[in-house]
Amino acid sequence: MAGEPIIKIEHLTKHFGGGRDEVAALEDINITIHSGEIFGVIGLSGAGKSTLVRCVNLLERPTAGTVWVDGREMTALSPKELREARKSIGMIFQSFNLLMQRTALENVCFPLELAGASRKDAEARGLELLELVDLKSRAGAYPAQLSGGQKQRVAIARTLATNPKVLLCDEATSALDPKTTRDILRLIRDINQRLGITVVVITHDMKVIEEICHRVAILDHGRVAEEGTVEEVFSRPRTEAGRRLVYPDGVPEELLRQNWAQGGGRVIRVAFNGGTAYQPLIASLAIDCGVKANILGADTRNIGGRAFGTMLLGLPEDDGQAAKALAYITSQKDITVEEVPDYHE
């Protein structure tokens, strides 16, 4: 379970450039991340995700606001104090940033050597970490001899060498195929559970958030649009930015024409979760209410072992029939309904 706050971002603002060329990358960001949790930050390209995570370890210095990590105000530290504080913050990237002339083991040992560890101690720790990421058998391989997933495992092992309390993952799976992505996400979740490391995941991919995160913040044009548990945000998005991420695909014009041709009128989005995801809603509408609805689209996903999904329905054009259908659907447990005007591509 998540513990006390370990990262506190307060009124963080980051601008680039100046004068007429000034660009606001982040505006008044307030986020608290608790010890031991996996926290996701998601948004479309240009939302400010990578800038935000780089402000956590002060790779980017905020224009205004404060960042606290493990009880230290990062924005107030001297250069020497900042170097010391960064030892407790690991970071992995989309590009693996391995030293090509060093073996996997030598890459993992590198930060230990910089910290003054003896060669013997560094190698012992390096082998231990390669075993943790299931890559001990490839300790003598060079990066060019490793697959993308194996390179990322080496990068993860290397960032764990200094025993960080926080692991920042900036699009860490974006360059990987789907199967390798799942493997790396399972590894990150295992590290979180076994070592208690707090993980911050930056991604544009909802599936990554669904797979491993406990809570999530949606960034939109440099601001936090929504924040909450993954279940809350993905099952019932409250903002337009949230809906764009959770419901990215429109209904093709052809399906809308078919809906109208079959006597359909308004289009509604039904969001359901838990056991309700498998209730025969359409059949129940027809049997219990005598109302026929057209299915224009449906999607179900698994979040934390529970089924969540959405269904786009074309209601009858007749207002009485449509009202009866809406009353029936809204009476069901754990179901939310919203009308979707002009919902098409």
PLM ranges: what are they?
Residues 102-109:
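Short coil-to-helix segment of the ABC ATPase nucleotide-binding domain corresponding to the Q-loop/switch region
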Residues 141-144, 162, 169:
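Conserved signature/switch motifs of ABC ATPase nucleotide-binding domains
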Residues 178-180:
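Helix N-cap at the start of a conserved alpha-helix in ABC-type nucleotide-binding domains
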